[in-house]
Amino acid sequence: MKFLVLWRIDLALVSGELARAIGRMPEYGQRLEQEGKVLARYHGVGAPGGAWIYDVDSHEEFEQLLGRAPVFNFAEYTVHALADMEPPTG
């Protein structure tokens, strides 16, 4: 199962705690990439946030990984389930 997650930081919440959470995101994302759970990570140019593509075995696993993100409590998320674009068969 693949999910595209667009996340955006609410700049009104900027604090020391948020800055530390943002600082932990690269390590968290790199670990998930090494485990094969995140296929790609992007920063939004001119926007406080990013886009990640998750590749997980279940919806429950996706929710767990998203909930463990250091910025989980500070960000707004838009989640899109993805499907491969295979040509029709038959």
Feature roles, as predicted:
Residues M1-G90:
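Conserved, structured core segments of small domains
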